[in-house]
Amino acid sequence: MMRKNILVIGGTGLVGKVILRILEARNPDFNLFVGSRQSGKTNKNLIVDVNNPKTLESIIQNKIDLIVLCTKDSNNEILQFAIQNKLDYIDITKPTPDLTIAYDLARANNQKINSRIVFSSGWMGGIVSSLVDFMEPDKHKIQETNIYIYYSVKDLAGKSSANFLAENVCKPFVVYKNNQPQHVKHFLNSERFNFSFGIGKRQVYNLDVPDLFILNQIEKIPTVLVKMTYNSKFVTSLMGYFQSLKIFNIMFLKERQLLFGSSGNGDQTIFEVIIKTKDKTKRVSLQSVKGQAELTAFSTVLHIEKMLSDTLSGGIYFSHQIHSSKEVYEALNTYSTINLKINE
């Protein structure tokens, strides 16, 4: 078998570095390249600037097989380049508005697609839909799926999620109730939720993540909600006040970036998925002891390994569509710093 050449664009960032570490440990035969805007110390460091298409030539020169995108690419230059050059592509960074644009662009080029194009920017590397499928394989039975997220400001945080919140906190986004899109805003519509892993009852507020789009528009689940709480009850209630009093509206973007951009030295992250059918409610709870970056990176590595196996034909996928959900569940469950609980 030929050695696979993998390029991680944004490989010097928080999640990119962890992807490279886990990939190298699990697959020493992969040939790993790091793409960033600065030149690096070795010939494995490629200058790749998503805003400068000329720099993309190095992707062809180095015979890259698969591109992992972990940086913002507003104009979808890398996606278009991958389609044109028949390269495998996985993107883990797109927030909902950008994801829908990229997905439409890929579908418009469907006839030209000869490689595997995978969108994996759902929560924590796109594993929620796999867990939903694992809990209830018959999607037609599911009436409602709710995701509850425990987000620690002490965790190591990448810039992309903080910048997304800073830029979009004042804009409405869509949740789905009985297949009717409803416009809501971040940090409103609070409810109480009892988290597992010793966290207990917390106020949770609206959050826009791509799983809203994926679970309703792709998986056809009629009602989908996502809500989050911060580890600090004070910070959580403060965000609620700021939104309800429209304080975010009068803040400069830089100020909002500072507010959302706080990052610590690492902390756990937790999310829980509630799946409701006509006659029962199921719940799966996941804790990543090492936080968001580790979980997102490990999920991404699972997708990369699947893409490079010879079992996946060319086409457009969301990451949960490339695996059996049992494979994903078992891989997560056996990873040393991830804990899973199931209540049926």
PLM features per residue range, with description:
Residues 94-115:
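Rossmann-fold NAD(P)-binding glycine/threonine-rich loop
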Residues 49-64, 74:
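Conserved Rossmann-fold cofactor-binding substructure of NAD(P)-dependent oxidoreductases
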Residues 82, 86-100:
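ADP-ribose/adenylate-binding Rossmann-like module
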Residues 6-24:
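N-terminal Rossmann NAD(P)H-binding glycine-rich loop of SDR-like oxidoreductase domains
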Residues 35-39, 50:
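N-terminal Rossmann-fold cofactor-binding loop
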Residues 65-70, 90-91:
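N-terminal Rossmann-like NAD(P) cofactor-binding module of classical short-chain dehydrogenase/reductase
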Residues 237-344:
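C-terminal active-site/capping subdomain that shapes the small-molecule cofactor and substrate pocket
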Residues 9, 138-265, 271-284:
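Active-site-lining helix/loop region of Rossmann-like oxidoreductase modules
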